Amino acid sequence: MSNRRLAPTVLALLLALPLAARAQGPPRLVLMLAVDQLRADRVGPELPGGLGRLVREGRWYPDAVLDHAVTETCAGHATMLTGRHPGATGLTGNVFLDVEAGRRVYCLEDAPERAGVIGVPGEGRSPRNLRVTTLGDWMKQVRPATRVFAVAGKDRSAIALGGQHADAAYWFSEEHFVGWTTSRHYAAELPEWIHAFNGVNPPKDGFLAALPERWEHLPETAQGAEGPDDFPGEAGDLSRTSPHPLRDGDLETFAEQLFASPWIDVVTLDLARELVTREGLGRGDAPDLLGISLSGNDVVGHRYGPNSHEARDALLRIDAAFGGFLDFLEAELGKGSVVVALTADHGVLPLPEWLAANGGSECPAENGRSGLKRMGLGLLWNLYWKFSPLSWPESWLVFAGPTIGVKRALARDEGVDVADVVARTKRHLEARPAVAHVWTRDEIENGDGEFAALYRHSYDPERSGDLVVQLAPTCLISSYGSGTTHGTPYLYDRAVPLVFFGPGIAPARIPGHAATVDIAPTLAHRLGVPTPEGLDGRVLFE
């Protein structure tokens, strides 16, 4: 072969070297996708869109769980990119307890004068209550050019995914129909492109203008459904059957209807697409991080249950919308440029009526439902007549989800030992059929067995109060006579999907234990980013 004929071949090889080196380097974008209340048994390779593609082409952990007991949104989201259990993150639930002040604290609240929510007077939000750092913080420490953004329907989801030093976190506010917003912890004003996305005169412009008048179920929804569309126990104020109102009433009513449908999740992905374009994510000198949480799926599940036509329709729409978003990322940044982790913050209990009809109820309480108001009033009167019958009636307790704290100031004023109030409260609640156990601080800190470990992972001595209530399996305590919820240590609340997808990640189905706390160390390992000492999670694969 002559030198003249060899030269083009050598030149082609030399030109290919930077591309090969870039392909072996870190991805351009890390995407953390959380689907609120997505049970593990809802996701599989049969889904035709983006979620199904992740399972088919990614590394799938079908037995993944939350490794903590109090399975709520704030706690679950905070485990994903910190690698720490809720007891360490400080975000033990959607609200936590300040027993000294005798009040509940929203998990990511902050002073309005320091971190006021734009457009919502008197409300402040920031990661101030998060005790630890996240993957985005670690990435920025190694490569300061890294940018970190998060977007979600719920403020707590976006802020928890963004971490301590996010460039911005955006969420949807129903109040006064603010639309998509942020807090002044991140920026003094919203960027113009967010204003344009919200619209100057909604619903005539902005994202609302593109929404249909009604939420009508897809034809394929009924094909994969597990029962009739109208099922006992479903919430009926926005219709128990297709179609459901979506643009009926004033703007605040629009917002409520939107959040009770899969359209809020479709819009979240639309906003994320706009964010990627406007901020140029994945186009810098360092990998960027984008956290997305799809919050509407949770509201749909609460209202109609995970086996409903509504939940099935929401899943199909999310699957399709995320498929389009993933195609967009690959078209913009190139195939092999994005690493994705998929999980959920918790699962959910099926409707008690559905369990009763299908032979799945284990709850000793009648109908599987117990009234929160009746149970709570009985307890409070019990304590009042025992400890302060001559004083003005006042609750001795403050509640945050399943956690209970005794008000310290009241106990001091009445000369009552806190331990006596704790013991009486425990006896009263454990006599109720719907309650399996009421955990004391000592039992949590020193107990043996799986449940003790799970509650220990959820427990923060400064924020979890004095008692934690464990309901009996499949029991539901609620103020409502319809819908369902989550928050227990049982697998229907703890089993979540977990999938990793991207360059260098071979398709595989990996049985066995994995947890949401494993996501951050696994992604950090793939990025070559050092992690803090003392993480609760582990690297799942090389």
Where are these regions (language model features)?
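Bacterial N-terminal signal peptides
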Residues: 8-18
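Non-catalytic, well-ordered alpha-helical segments in soluble enzyme domains
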Residues: 40, 53, 132-141, 401-439, ...
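Short, structured active-site-proximal loop/turn typified by the sulfatase FGly-forming signature C/S-X-P-X-R
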Residues: 41-90, 95, 145-151
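Secreted, luminal/periplasmic, and some membrane-associated catalytic domains
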Residues: 72, 94-124, 162-164, 168, ...
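Active-site regions of oxyanion-processing enzymes, predominantly non-cytosolic
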Residues: 146-152, 158-159, 220-226, 265-299, ...
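Active-site His/acidic residue clusters
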Residues: 159-168, 243-256, 260, 283-318, ...
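Long, low-complexity, polar/charged, intrinsically disordered or flexibly structured peripheral segments
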Residues: 204-274
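A long, amphipathic alpha-helix that forms part
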Residues: 258-284, 297-338, 422-424, 428, ...
